[in-house]
């Protein structure tokens, strides 16, 4: 949890940031929560690197540079403030990244009739013109076992469990630092 970016991002707590592997796995030094500003800077850095490294769009079942750009647009929108107190620089960056995705001509809004059956379509079907990225989970592809990743997010026809929670161990680690 973190406060909105426009509410003192330097002072409010964000999430713990760990870059790289610890040298000593037996004696971990648990990181404190970083500031909201540092958290957003890390997210932006990661997404810009992803945009640089990812390929063009192939299918919604694969992350692409357009998925990174769509997320960059969303992050900058969150940073752009409120209607009464906007940050025009971040609003412009949000617009620029969203426009990159729109102008790519890789995506289009679904018709009303197609949208009404959206959840019945395979994530990588040609008719999925509106989806930029989706975790692929098709129950028939996995028989009784479910998709290792997709089943965590969706429960379809009795397959999967559709729940993702932070583990008790993770929550305990967060509380150990005393800065939550």
Regions found by a protein language model. Name each.
Residues 1-180:
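Structured, solvent-exposed acidic/aromatic patches
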């Amino acid at each position: 949890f973190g406060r909105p970016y426009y509410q003192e991002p330097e002072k409010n707590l964000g999430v713990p940031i760990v870059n790289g592997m610890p040298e000593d796995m037996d004696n971990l030094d648990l990181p404190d929560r970083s500031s909201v500003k540092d958290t957003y800077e890390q997210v932006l850095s990661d997404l810009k690197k992803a945009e640089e490294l990812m390929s063009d769009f192939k299918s919604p079942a694969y992350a692409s540079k357009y998925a990174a750009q769509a997320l960059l647009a969303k992050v900058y929108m969150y940073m752009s403030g409120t209607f009464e107190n906007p940050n025009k620089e971040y609003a412009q960056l949000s617009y620029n990244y969203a426009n990159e995705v729109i102008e790519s001509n890789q995506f289009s809004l679904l018709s009303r009739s197609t949208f009404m059956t959206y959840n019945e379509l395979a994530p990588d079907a040609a008719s999925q013109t509106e989806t930029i990225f989706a975790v692929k989970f098709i129950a028939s592809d996995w028989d009784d076992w479910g998709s290792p990743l997709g089943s965590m997010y969706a429960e379809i026809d009795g397959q999967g469990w559709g729940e993702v929670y932070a583990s008790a161990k993770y929550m305990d680690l967060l509380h150990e630092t005393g800065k939550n």
